Amino acid sequence: MASSSNYNTYMQYLNPPPYADHGANQLIPADQLSNQQGITPNYVGDLNLDDQFKGNVCHAFTLEAIIDISAYNERTVKGVPAWLPLGIMSNFEYPLAHTVAALLTGSYTITQFTHNGQKFVRVNRLGTGIPAHPLRMLREGNQAFIQNMVIPRNFSTNQFTYNLTNLVLSVQKLPDDAWRPSKDKLIGNTMHPAVSIHPNLPPIVLPTVKKQAYRQHKNPNNGPLLAISGILHQLRVEKVPEKTSLFRISLPADMFSVKEGMMKKRGENSPVVYFQAPENFPLNGFNNRQVVLAYANPTLSAV
């Protein structure tokens, strides 16, 4: 369903409840969060630093944590996995080597808190933030996730104490057919149609719909949003083989323009959009998802 307000869901992503008390680049002192020592991540992935000189290369960044969960009046459950998506970024947005270095040299803690009855897991990076960085973890120094989205659901009913025992940074290079907005669109203030799959995950930014695709709609102001919402039933989600928590949408070539996208292979028949989601993300399409307008670069503020 298209949103006439355009910004509501996207603003939830820019300013979700867990960050309401903390401005950009304000890192919370570790002693206010946890008594545990910070832990430095290991690294896995298909990182080739030669890619840092290629502006149209995109990578997905994920922290994979192992935590011990201690419930009140219950024994500790050890070795619980947590999936913490940091986002997808191209070299147009920030140099790859600098991003990886900042993530790997940081020290992290993990805590739990409740906001308006909803339980969150907050990951805290100790050190100095990078104000203009596209990844929230590096920009603001902390990132929160709804608890039942990132750890097994059977740990979602009570209050727990977390102890971070292992942390791995996973960097996954997106395939060459990945669509991303072109450089001038990315660093500018142009908004794109997008599909919101979760209020605490970034909207999935889509290419601009071809003009003829929304001529059928009578309201020109809502044309792009209505055009996207009218074809959601045609979109199908596929799990990317051999990638962790990475999914893709192959868009109908006759409905979407790829001219503004960063396509390495210009001969592709249709744009392919990649996004991060939990491994159990449903693959039955995007019906009933909210359509919004979103900036490709989440460091921008909606006006």
Curated annotation (Swiss-Prot):
A motif (PPXY motif) lies at residues 16-19. InterPro entries: EV_matrix (IPR008986), EV_matrix_protein_N (IPR043079), EV_matrix_sf (IPR038057). Changing residue 184 to N: In strain: pp3/guinea pig lethal. SUPFAM superfamilies: EV matrix protein. GO terms for biological process: symbiont-mediated suppression of host innate immune response; symbiont-mediated suppression of host JAK-STAT cascade via inhibition of JAK1 activity; symbiont-mediated suppression of host type I interferon-mediated signaling pathway; viral budding from plasma membrane; viral budding via host ESCRT complex. GO terms for molecular function: structural constituent of virion. Pfam families: Matrix_Filo. It is a peripheral membrane protein. Changing residue 16 to S: In strain: Isolate Feldmann. It is found in: Virion membrane; Host late endosome membrane; Host cell membrane; Host endomembrane system. One of its GO terms (cellular component) is virion membrane. It comes from the Viruses. Keywords: Host cell membrane, Host endosome, Host membrane, Host-virus interaction, Inhibition of host innate immune response by virus, Inhibition of host interferon signaling pathway by virus, Inhibition of host JAK1 by virus, Interferon antiviral system evasion, Membrane, Viral budding, Viral budding via the host ESCRT complexes, Viral immunoevasion, Viral matrix protein, Viral release from host cell, Virion. Most abundant protein in the virion. Exists as a dimer until it reorganizes at the plasma membrane into multimeric form. Interacts with host TSG101. Interacts (via PPXY motif) with SMURF2 (via WW domains); the interaction positively regulates virus budding. Plays an essential role virus particle assembly and budding. Promotes virus assembly and budding by interacting with host proteins of the multivesicular body pathway. The interaction with host E3 ubiquitin ligase SMURF2 facilitates virus budding. The interaction with the nucleocapsid and the plasma membrane may also facilitate virus budding. Specific interactions with membrane-associated GP and VP24 during the budding process may also occur. May play a role in genome replication. Late-budding domains (L domains) are short sequence motifs essential for viral particle budding. They recruit proteins of the host ESCRT machinery (Endosomal Sorting Complex Required for Transport) or ESCRT-associated proteins. VP40 contains one L domain: a PPXY motif which potentially interacts with the WW domain 3 of NEDD4 E3 ubiquitin ligase and the three WW domains of SMURF2 E3 ubiquitin ligase. This is Matrix protein VP40. It comes from Lake Victoria marburgvirus (strain Musoke-80). The gene is VP40.
